[in-house]
Swiss-Prot record:
It comes from Aspergillus oryzae (strain ATCC 42149 / RIB 40) (Yellow koji mold). Residues 182-191 have a biased composition (Basic and acidic residues). This is Protein pxr1. The keyword rRNA processing applies. It comes from the Eukaryota. Involved in rRNA-processing at A0, A1 and A2 sites and negatively regulates telomerase. GO terms for cellular component: nucleolus. PROSITE patterns: G_PATCH.
Amino acid sequence: MGLAAPRKRTKISHDPNNTNWSRSTSGYGHKIMSSQGWTPGSFLGARNAAHADMFTAASASHIRVVVKDDTLGLGARSKRDPLDEPTGLDAFKGLLGRLNGKSDADLEAEQKKHEDAKIARYAATKWHTVTFISGGLLAQEKLVSLSAQKESPGAQHGSHQNRGGLDMQKSEEDANTSIKDNTLKALREEQVSSVPIAEDTSRSKSKRHRKDEQGKKDKKERKTKKRKHMDEPSPIDSDIPERAILETDLQATVTDSRDTTPPVAKVLSKERRPMGRHLLRGRHIAQKKKALMDDRSLNEIFMVKS
C-alpha cells in the first residue's frame, strides 16, 4: 500500500529470549510440582525406579521442542540428509570457545563428541539400528541345585547296567507273549472258517439262482407291456381313410423319385402322433414333413420347373 497503509507499531518484548516462563516460580505448574516434593534440578518419577540408572543431566532439563515443517507422521524420518549442516560450523564453534576462554582439551572433547554424533547418524541412516529399552531383569522361576543331580560315576554305571538287564528281560517276555497270541488267533480262525464254508457256498448259490429268476420274470413282464402298448390302436381312428390316400400318393411319388434319385429317408407306415394341444395340428405337420421329403413337392414349393 505504500505510505497510504495504516501504521503498525511493534514493541520489543521485555523477554526476547522467552526465558521468563522457565525461571518464574509463581506459575501454577511450579506450585503443584513443588507441593508434591519436586525441586528444580531433580528428576520426575520414583527415585528407586528400575530405569533410574539411565537418567542423565538432560533428564532434569526442560523438554526441547522441534518445529515440524513437513507433513510426515510422528516419528517419521525425513528423506533429507541429516548431516546437511552449514560447512565450517564446528570450526566456528571452536573459535567462539577459544574466545570465551576454553582450553584446548575441552575443545577437543567437544569436537570428538560432534564427530561421534555424525558417525552415529550416518550409520543409523545407512544401516537401520535397533535401540533396546531395559524392562527389568530376567530371573529363573525355580532354582534347582546341581549338587542333588550329581552322583558318583560308579553308581551311575551300575544303575545303567541294571536298567539294561531289566529292559532285555522285558523285551524277551513281550516277544514270547506276542508269539503265543498270534498262534492262538490263527488256530481259532481256522476252526471257525472251516465249518461254515459249505453253508456259505450253498446259500450264495441259492441267492444267485433266485436273483436270476426274478430278473428273467421282470424282463418278460416289461416285454409284454411294450407289446401291448405298441399293439393298442391310436386314439384318432377318423383319420384312417385320409392316411391311406396320403400313403398311396406318397408311394407313387417315391417310385417316380427312385428312378431319378435315391430316397432320402424311409417313410414309416405307423407314425405316433403327439397327444394334447398338438392333436389338431398333427395333420398339417405330417403333410409338411412328407412334402419336404419329396423332390417334386419341393420343386412346386420353390416354383422350379422339373
